[in-house]
From Swiss-Prot:
The lineage of its organism: Viruses, Varidnaviria, Bamfordvirae, Preplasmiviricota, Tectiliviricetes. Induction: Expressed in the intermediate phase of the viral replicative cycle. One of its GO terms (biological process) is symbiont entry into host cell. The keyword Chaperone does not apply. It is found in: Virion; Host nucleus. Its main location: virion. GO terms for cellular component: host cell nucleus; viral capsid, decoration. Three N-terminal domains of hexon-interlacing protein form triskelions between hexon capsomers. Keywords: Capsid decoration protein, Capsid protein, Coiled coil, Host nucleus, Host-virus interaction, Virion, Virus entry into host cell. This protein is only encoded by mastadenoviruses, and may therefore play a role in mammals tropism. This is Hexon-interlacing protein. It comes from the Viruses. Homotrimer. Interacts with hexon protein; this interaction tethers the hexons together. Self-interacts with adjacent proteins. Interacts with kinesin light chain KLC1; this interaction leads to capsid disruption at the nuclear pore complex during virus entry into host cell.
Amino acid sequence: MSTNSFDGSIVSSYLTTRMPPWAGVRQNVMGSSIDGRPVLPANSTTLTYETVSGTPLETAASAAASAAAATARGIVTDFAFLSPLASSAASRSSARDDKLTALLAQLDSLTRELNVVSQQLLDLRQQVSALKASSPPNAV
């Protein structure tokens, strides 16, 4: 079977990568689909996607999917490409942490102020209750 022929089956590494370790599947060994056809292992450098019917649109889509998978794999393994992105993400994370710390400090300050105001309100209620209790009923 040629890897470029699209004869109706969907071929992926799903069947070999999802098997439990006790099933004896090795990552560098060719697997097989339900109907016994070969499936490339999960650590293969090429993933091919075959289509159900061989229309030109599906063929182009499967070629694009294969190219996207290869590109994604290349990007993931290219640490030189990822390191500026990682440092940028780390600086954004640090800035977010600083903002969060400032917000938490403000929240703590507001909580203390709220406690003071709540205590003052409680004192005022007690004073009003004491005044009502000590004043004659018709004085209001």
